[in-house]
Amino acid sequence: MSIVNELVNRIDETYDVSQIEKEIKLDNIALSDLELLATGGYSPLTGFLGKEDYDSVVETLRLANGSVWSIPITLPVTEKVAESLKAGEEVKLVNNGNIYGVIQIEDIFVPDKEKEALLVYKTTDEAHPGVKKLYERPNVYVGGTIILTKRFENNQFPSYHLDPIETREAFKKRGWKTVVGFQTRNPVHRAHEYIQKSALEIVDGLFLNPLVGETKSDDIPADVRMESYEVLLQNYYPKNRVFLSVFPAAMRYAGPREAIFHALVRKNFGCTHFIVGRDHAGVGDYYGTYEAQEIFTNFTIEELGITPLFFEHSFYCTKCEAMASTKTCPHGKEDHVILSGTKVRELLRNGEIPPSTFSRKEVVEVLIKGLKKEVVTE
């Protein structure tokens, strides 16, 4: 499948903001969204959603023009700030004293957050991290086209922080016609490795694209995860078949809807295929095990523009003495060692070393070292 969609580009570092007086302060989520809107990561979006598109996305998983889009990308402001704004004006977008862009306001509206929570996250339970964040953010949304006027100083992972145009170029340079994307917020354990390598058997390249934006407090820190990916790729993957780059978005924990969103974004980064595993982007027990795969049946491959690859839950089978899934292994549950990022995190935080059936020893060493450092700095 060739990539025909045009990338949005809303970057203009020469744009004059000196005459613009009003400003909106961005939180970390809005800041990372601003960057991804501007670089084309969120193509076809050109800005934060106005009311018509917002309502359409929340209710139908499509923009008002019918294009598939499953997560509302919004710019929340307080009532006080909203009172000072009006449609038709340009306003600076600021974070931590720096001006990063402008928004050309088209719309100011009050969303029904309970409805957004129920339809996007399938729950109004504030124990859900996505719902909690939704309710914590201000209550008025500002919609409009954006311009990014200043690039972020990406000090944490500068060499891995690439725009969609750059990853597309990198794939082209390698001669990859088919590329499978893999989204992760966890260290890669053996079940992930099995799935990635199974997918790699049928495509030219693997795009490992860990999310490094805002995540839950008990998720393993991004710098530790990045080091774990580096040692894994160095020791267990063919160098000419994998590409590592970060995804600077915040985690929404929206399960099925976020699986669609993650696929659409990876299409923009240049992928032709996208891996959807068990409970993709899930949290707790809010979503069914394979709900994130089932949601794809609502859309055609043509309108998605990317082919999802579905994988069953994989495990280590003590009888097969190998990684397997129920599709490839005849043995019972008593012979299966179930692996999960949650389990690996749990073992590590309890000071236990995950067995080699769970994680590669080089990865475990990095995680132990990283978590010790985390404990020291807390």
Curated annotation (Swiss-Prot):
InterPro entries: ATP-Sase_PUA-like_dom, PUA-like_sf, Rossmann-like_a/b/a_fold, SO4_adenylyltransferase_pro, Sulfurylase_cat_dom, Sulphate_adenylyltransferase. CDD domains: ATPS. It comes from the Bacteria. Its EC number is 2.7.7.4. Transmembrane segments: none annotated. The keyword Lyase does not apply. It catalyses: sulfate + ATP + H(+) = adenosine 5'-phosphosulfate + diphosphate. SUPFAM superfamilies: Nucleotidylyl transferase, PUA domain-like. Keywords: ATP-binding, Nucleotide-binding, Nucleotidyltransferase, Transferase. Pfam families: ATP-sulfurylase, PUA_2. One of its GO terms (biological process) is sulfate assimilation. It is an enzyme of class 2 (transferase). Pathway: Sulfur metabolism; hydrogen sulfide biosynthesis; sulfite from sulfate: step 1/3. GO terms for molecular function: ATP binding; sulfate adenylyltransferase (ATP) activity. The keyword Nucleotidyltransferase applies. Belongs to the sulfate adenylyltransferase family. HAMAP family: Sulf_adenylyltr. This is Sulfate adenylyltransferase.
